[in-house]
Amino acid sequence: MALAEPSRLTKPLPGGREGATVVLHPMLCAYMYSPPEFMAMTGGRLKVVRQVLFARKQQIKIPIVAFLVEHPVVGPMIIDTGFHPSVATDPKQNLGRLYAALYNIEMQPDQAISAQLRERKGIEPSDVRVAIMTHLHMDHASAISEFTSATYVLGAGEWRAFHGARPKLNGYVRHHVEHAVEYKEVPYDSPVIDSYSTFGRAYDLFGDGSVRLVATPGHTHGHQSVILRLKDREALVTGDAIYFTRTLDDERRGWAMADEHKWHRSIGEIRLYRRENPDALIIPGHDPEAWATLLPKYE
């Protein structure tokens, strides 16, 4: 299926309201078992391969997550999609044989974000009009087909990386994005981009300061993180810019890495943000310890 290139954002999306704050709902979509070296390398790539092939009992259980964000005018939006509901019963149908064989996934059908939105909030997938994608790896983009009314907002370079050579070896599954949805790209190299806090490249998505997208490339070429304005503080959803909170201190990179130099720069910006905003809620991509401390709702 041939898809049109994403259009570049040149102005904020409609719905902004001066002084608006948002409500954040973290949502656990599944657990996936991963070799420790895949998430935080202490040796070379050969050590990772050995753990994948021969040390499955040593694997760690990591959360697969997505987020509901409620804006007073825009309404419900999501950050990432988590796994498609079918992954709960037949992973290879959505993820393909390679990833279904590589990863042991624990998921119930009612953990899919579409099911959780209905159960927890009475929100139908068609009510979600904006979906912010930190990146398009399979554990973040598997359920794009569930939210076909949404405009999907990608970081600059992610679409090109997704459609590059050997997508599956780089964490992408082509059919995850092959749906008749609108894709838009944040042009982090254009004059509409500003800086914000400790981040050199930021985009005010609705023009009201409630949702800011910040470029955090490295894990993927087009990776972005999300800063949300709550009533009394900010929340930073890092995506996979950092897998664990401790990554900010030990700087142990994961296996999946598009540009290590840019990754170090990105985590440097996040580390400085943490120091300058000690009250901010910082949510890493796959940290079981951090996830265990999260509340169901942040206002």
Predicted regions and their residues:
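Active-site metal-binding motif and surrounding structural segment of the metallo-beta-lactamase
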Residues: 64, 92-154
